[in-house]
């Protein structure tokens, strides 16, 4: 233990015998087991670029306000740049005894540039520092997810264009319901992911306010220019309440929620891929690049990656629930519990980036088996609703028409045939309103073509919908391109 008063106010012996940066009030070092238990460095080291950017902006503002000298600010900026370059290159060794990314960088900065490094933390607490790092990180993660979201939507729209004449059964309760265009089905997912993009943008916006200057919880007596720091870091504004600034994690929950809904959409699509690629359906054949085999059954071609995407949704949901439970009992302002806020967010973003990329690859390389889809359109009485509509359009109340066609379906099931297989005489016996043109109501392409309402599955309606989906992509790409300055995630922290 160093007893020099000039060091004691700033350092405290850590578990390894070196000094901590917060220890003036303590006489004993932390236990070795708590040193590792309390350290957040294994997680928050991935925010090193955000931490360095925040420190540069803070130092620049301190110099502009006359709180530190221009020479100190220049030394700090140069030192931080050198540290960032070393981390980027994989030439920086993180020490668990430094506790977190803030202490790791600050202690190394002080080692490199001396006294000026000790002035960096003037007017700042780790509470507002970590909140700033995390907000910058969420903006970067949301942006990455938005970009991957756009890429998947392009794949879906391209597939919808390619398969604009392919018809397959639509399902309710996993039972044959009505025929739809495959393009219509794929566009349904495109719209789901379009809503996800909007939620991701909302999470980005929720994080786009700067906590720096809130200090520990009550603000500071230094004449800080919070607006300058916020602008330097690309934030839209400052957070108006210092207590809220250091303790709010709603923006992280927004990212988790947006990610969870998107994971749910990915899981639903994955479930259909698993079903469609099965022998029972045979609607699609997955590329070998997106399938695996069995260690014992030579014939197997498994949709493992679709299943993994489906399974990983639970992991993403768990991260959302974890943070909700962590937050629900915290009084104002900062509590150490908040250290648990970052690992789940990083995991969710990494998981979803992989899922979005794999899904895009699966769809862009699959083979659609049009004959299998057409075959299934010939079973399950997909024309039943249109036969009922045929009678209703001729004056029979729809509920009575429904009963008539239900009786015909029952007759088909007893005979082991479909509605289109019934002789015309059987239709006339069921209702004198049936005429020879009933065959048009039984024709699958005609049924699809008749669904001309806005948002319907008729080719003409789907063509309009496709234009809207493409236009929405253009709008969202514009939104993506106009995002405020973002400190991108670094990949040098090993």
Model-derived features: positions:
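Acidic, glycine-rich loop-and-beta core segments that form the ion-binding/anion-interacting portion
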Residues: 234-325
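Short amphipathic alpha-helical segments with heptad-repeat character
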Residues: 135, 139-146, 150, 157, ...
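A helix-coil-helix interface module used to build multimeric assemblies
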Residues: 15-219, 224-231, 292-293, 304, ...
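Glycine-rich cofactor/substrate-binding loops
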Residues: 18-54, 115-116, 297-494
